[in-house]
């Protein structure tokens, strides 16, 4: 392109809302390229959207279509958090399952810098909550985590935004625990 472009990558998670939520803001310089390595999982009726302020953008998307499993399935959640200074458990592992989270990203859409955000994990069996990270996120900025979090039944990942709205996206594998024989 002959000019810089401002772009948003968004996910519409139809199990939660019919509105698309930005999960990444990107500026691409004139004539430049960008590559996003974001593991996005779309479930039935979900949509991936790209918004740009410059026409005639070329986008390449690589994907894999997975069958829905009986005992395990890949899931994704995209949610808008609209209450500042209040913890939101955006993923809670259901009873009889284990969840392996491989990616979490928070996108600040508040219009200003959110300076005191907190990302935590709650271990329900120990009744304890531990801080994973805390700090500031600029407007249209992101805080992303490409690391594994394992949640057992009742455990949760939580985010407390300093400003609102914040969009959260997470991809994970949900494994249904098999019944134990002989009990």
Predicted features, each with a name:
Residues 29-45, 139-154:
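Beta-sandwich interaction modules
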